């Protein structure tokens, strides 16, 4: 597949100072500061290691959480974790673009790796502006003169237009890291060259995201069917005239999703037969799973899809040549209500189709179940992959594409 942006392969990195933007934002214990899950650090270690071994002086830029949150910390522990994963020294400095950071960058030798401080300690990083405006921020103007090449590997943040993500690409020869390259190849392939039949399984509680994706993939013809689960399914059931019971209808209203019920009516009419809804659900009665036909839902919380629906959905998944899934089928963390999520994941993993899971809770569930080897691609960036599938432009990809169009390498 021909990519519209440069990758690591397009650059000679020998003895060059390379700035690499990664997304190693990780779960951190707020009381000890220790990293609870180093999955993202392991993921990006591949790109960092390759750049360093090609003789570059590697400067790593990353963020952790955001101001006001308990896990908004320094990147000192991340440097230690990265060093352990790479089995080689990774230096850390508690500065981003000040004199200390710049002097440390200038002292780097071939093969050295330096992790700068949490980029979100810098207030301008939170601003969302045009890449050319971000290129004029203090951080970019201070750092770019001592950098030769910028590599962006932060796919999970590709939907954000912030200085560290888009500003450097305006000033420097720039390309995508290995994670960015792999993610975009997989997702573009699923959208532009999806083998038919193509089935999307959309669930979870982020109704706005799912409905954006549903509308885009049905309208542009890349999907043949959308199987709805989770709160997304409840929205469409209500839109189709099903009585969900006061508890479930109030839940939708309190979440601020009532407008999507009307939107659901329009979509059901426009894409008649292509949007599939559960014909039975599992509700929580005295902390136990009880299944009901959707025509007879009691005034109890819906926590999962029912077994008849699981069987019906499995047929669509097994027949599909391309499958994309995002969001769990129900409250899978609660005992007795993980059946829908688990069975759908098992069916996807055992299918012969090209399969993608869009990150987040569903990806975590697949990993916990040991099914990741049966999935063609598990995305590292839920928000970015959802935006791409919803037809939205990703600012990071846009500016990297502009770099290649202008031949700036």
Swiss-Prot record:
It comes from the Archaea. GO terms for molecular function: ADP binding; ATP binding; phosphoglycerate kinase activity. It is found in: Cytoplasm. Substrate binds at residues 23-25, 63-66, 120, 160. Its main location: cytoplasm. Pathway: Carbohydrate degradation; glycolysis; pyruvate from D-glyceraldehyde 3-phosphate: step 2/5. Keywords: ATP-binding, Cytoplasm, Glycolysis, Kinase, Nucleotide-binding, Transferase. CDD domains: Phosphoglycerate_kinase. ATP binds at residues 333, 359-362. It is an enzyme of class 2 (transferase). One of its GO terms (cellular component) is cytosol. InterPro entries: Phosphoglycerate_kinase, Phosphoglycerate_kinase_CS, Phosphoglycerate_kinase_N, Phosphoglycerate_kinase_sf. It catalyses: (2R)-3-phosphoglycerate + ATP = (2R)-3-phospho-glyceroyl phosphate + ADP. GO terms for biological process: gluconeogenesis; glycolytic process. SUPFAM superfamilies: Phosphoglycerate kinase. Belongs to the phosphoglycerate kinase family. Monomer. This is Phosphoglycerate kinase. It comes from Methanobacterium bryantii. The gene is pgk.
